[in-house]
A protein has these predicted regions:
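Sec-dependent signal peptide cleavage junction
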Residues: 14-36
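Aromatic, loop-rich ligand-recognition surfaces of beta-strand-rich domains
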Residues: 459-523, 534-578
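Disordered, acidic Ser/Thr/Pro-rich linker "stalks" and the adjacent N-terminal cap
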Residues: 419-484, 496-503, 525, 530, ...
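Serine/threonine-rich, repeat-prone extracellular segments and beta-strand-based repeat modules
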Residues: 609-649
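Solvent-exposed, low-complexity, repeat-rich "mucin-like" stalks and linkers
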Residues: 579-610, 668-671
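Conserved blade-ending motifs and adjacent loop-strand segments that build the rim/top face
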Residues: 353-373
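C-terminal edge beta-strand
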Residues: 649-659
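Beta-rich carbohydrate-recognition and catalytic domains
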Residues: 36-160, 167-230, 239-298, 309-314, ...
Length: 671
């Protein structure tokens, strides 16, 4: 199967929100635009920043009408009324955050791939800006096209992958007039490309304003792939408390770092010169190792390192993935990523693995940055969850980071798929998915993620049972297992095909798990059609069943003495909503101060004369909610009970937080 062998070298609406294009009166004439005379953004409101960059256009983003947990992605409604205009319908990726002058800058790349394009099309960068009040309200200003890849004369003008902007205060933090900004970006080097080499290199641009215009700071690449011997992308710049600057970068399981030169008199870091070996030209590179010193990066590292210091500890946050150094257990497919982190007592490692901050999302990468803004800490990343999004049309998100007393990080990551956190008659998203077989790069979890793409551009966008062409097995099954009980009377299945191995099934059926543990066919099915494609779901209705599991059983078409493979992009299960389900409020729970509450996995739902214990998805509970004694409400959504979108979902539970609370011992007799 062609989907099982390729890898991509890269770094990588419930309610409407307003998006309005404006041209601030502070914009200067194009003929006066230079990096040296760019007006300072200090002292200006985030939505009225002055600039003299003729390429910049501005959009105001207001997500305040959305429930707070649904404000991701930041630009989720930006330009969706003009879907084919990618200057307005903006897809952003590879976020890197900067706190400057009381404002939060989230710099991004710009995805311009068509919906069916299976690679990256990136040529410029933009930035979302807000302040503390704006962040709390979901309000941002988007300054688009602050820089283009062709600003470097030695670059091809594309490959505008993940970059980072840092501010240099010139040793005078109270005086913003002499501040400079440096933009570290990967671009494609013309000379390397002409020589048939991996073209990626890191360039560094500078400007008096984070909105540009920018100029090449050194007139050549800072680092090239021929120098580093790895694809030189994903730069992350960090200045330690002693004034030493470090540039981390790397991908495909290898993370490198290099120290920047320091001024012998001031002790301040250079932003444009790296340390070299004794010959004066060869970069003095450091290979990151995990705590066991047996890999070319921290455990599970794939790419997108972000290094910072908090107290005496250095934190290395990165995309974890299976192609990485070691095994990232947070993902199933080679084409997925989660956000992991490791720690060290040195910015050059070795790195001790700590865990996952944000679980795997809906894009092949996530590309994190972590920083303190005001009194809180935040993590930025991207997903494919904007309307029309794919793995190559991504959108940037931001969530709060919580810290434990011993310096561990967790994120109250708000799901970006509304289907899972809003009342709905589709109960599929509440189920755990299993399969009799899954092709290695495919992902069985894609079938209940709420996304039906026009084109499957990477393997995790669907589930397939591909083994060979043809294959000896006649068919396979997908199974939904719920923690509680659901009452369902319909299913909708999207089958996928390709020009090679994947065909519509010859036949399929829905089965349910009976109370005695036996699989049985649903009764009175309306019919099992076998159409394919996004616009052609196959819907079947049947007599309502009360069950904890459903099976989608498929038989492949007979071909060449064997059977064709089948693929499923999405499988929905419809609750028996016509029976007007009613929820019984759950009993309150108690937890100890500082301990996350254990919320009930199910609540009772009455369907006519039948009562079932239905599963619940609880909305994320911030650590601050149980940090001290008191009480609060947790909100969630019960499977299969429809309703309007709301902050509160359709069920709540009272949580009491007590100092020194200890739960009673479990005296239930094992069954």
């Amino acid at each position: 199967s062609p989907t099982s062998v390729w890898l991509i070298p890269r770094s990588p609406a419930i309610l409407a929100a307003a998006s309005t294009v404006i041209s601030p009166p502070t914009a200067m004439a194009a003929d006066s635009a230079t990096a040296d005379n760019a007006p300072s953004v200090a002292g200006h409101a985030y939505n009225e920043l002055p600039y003299n960059n003729p390429d910049v256009t501005v959009t105001q983003i207001d997500n305040s009408a959305l429930p707070s947990y649904m404000r991701n992605p930041i630009g989720q409604n930006e330009g969706i009324d003009t879907p084919n205009d990618l200057s307005q319908n903006y897809y952003s990726a590879d976020a890197s955050a900067l706190s400057y002058d009381g404002k939060l800058f989230v710099f991004t790349g710009h995805d311009e791939a068509s919906p069916d394009y299976g690679s990256f099309n990136m040529k410029d960068w933009g930035v979302y800006v807000t302040d503390e009040d704006g962040l709390n309200q979901g309000k941002w200003t988007h300054y688009k096209t602050i820089a283009k890849a062709d600003l470097f004369s030695w670059a091809t003008g594309d490959g505008a992958y993940a970059g980072q902007v840092v501010a240099d205060d010139n040793g005078t933090p109270s005086d913003t007039s002499d501040d400079w900004f440096y933009y570290y970006v990967p671009v494609k080097d013309k000379a390397s490309e002409a020589a048939g080499q991996d073209p990626f290199a890191i360039g560094v641009a500078k400007s008096k304003s984070p909105l540009g215009p920018w100029k090449d700071a050194i007139g050549k690449p800072l680092l090239t792939t021929s120098q580093t011997q790895i694809e030189t992308i994903d730069p992350a710049f960090f200045v330690d408390e002693d004034g030493t600057g470090y540039l981390h970068f790397g991908t495909f399981g290898t993370q490198l770092a290099i120290k920047m030169k320091k001024d012998a008199t001031t002790g301040r870091t250079s932003y444009t010169e790296t340390e070299t070996k004794a010959d004066g030209t060869t970069p003095n590179l450091h290979t990151m190792k995990d705590a066991d010193n047996n890999a070319n990066g921290p455990k599970g590292f794939f790419e997108a390192a972000w290094v910072f210091r908090k107290g005496d500890t250095y934190y290395n946050v990165y995309d974890g993935g299976k192609p990485g150094s070691g095994t990232a257990t947070c993902v199933e497919s080679n084409y997925q990523a989660c956000i992991q982190y490791s720690t060290s007592d040195s910015p050059l490692g070795p790195w001790k693995y700590q865990g996952v901050i944000v679980p795997s999302g809906s894009a092949t990468t996530m590309h994190p940055s972590v920083l303190q803004f005001g009194d809180k800490w935040y993590v930025t990343y991207h997903t494919g969850d904007k309307e029309g999004g794919t793995d190559f049309r991504r959108a940037v998100c931001i969530d709060e980071v919580d810290w434990t007393a011993d310096g561990q990080m967790t994120s109250t990551a708000h799901p970006t798929k509304a289907e899972k956190t809003q009342p709905s008659t589709n109960v599929a998203s509440y189920a755990k998915v299993s399969a009799t077989f899954t092709e290695t790069p495919a992902y069985k979890g894609s079938v209940n993620d709420g996304r039906v793409l026009q084109t499957i551009v990477v393997p995790p966008n669907h589930w397939t049972n591909y083994r060979s062409i043809p294959q000896p097995q006649s068919g396979d099954s997908l199974v939904y297992q719920w923690d509680g009980t659901v009452r369902a009377n319909s299913s909708k299945v999207w089958f996928d095909v390709d020009s090679n191995a994947l065909r519509a099934p010859a036949s399929w059926k829905i089965q349910y798990l009976d109370a005695d543990g036996t699989w049985k066919d649903v009764t009175s099915p309306s019919g099992y059609t076998t159409t394919t494609g996004k616009a052609n779901p196959n819907t079947v209705t049947f007599d309502a069943v009360t069950t904890t599991a459903l099976k989608l059983d498929m038989t492949g078409q007979a071909v060449d003495g064997g059977y064709a493979s089948v693929a499923v992009a999405e499988w929905e299960v419809g609750a028996a909503d016509s029976e007007s389900p009613a929820i019984t409020a759950p009993k309150g729970v108690t937890t100890a101060t500082g301990t996350a509450p254990t919320l009930p996995a199910t609540v009772d739902v009455k369907y006519g004369d039948t009562t079932v214990a239905s599963p619940v998805i609880w909305r994320p509970v911030a650590a601050s909610s149980y940090a001290k004694a008191g009480s609060f409400k947790a909100y969630g959504v019960v499977a299969g009970v429809p309703g309007e979108a709301s902050e509160q979902g359709n069920v709540s539970v009272n949580v009491t937080v007590q100092d020194g609370y200890k739960p009673a011992a479990d005296t239930t007799k094992p069954t």
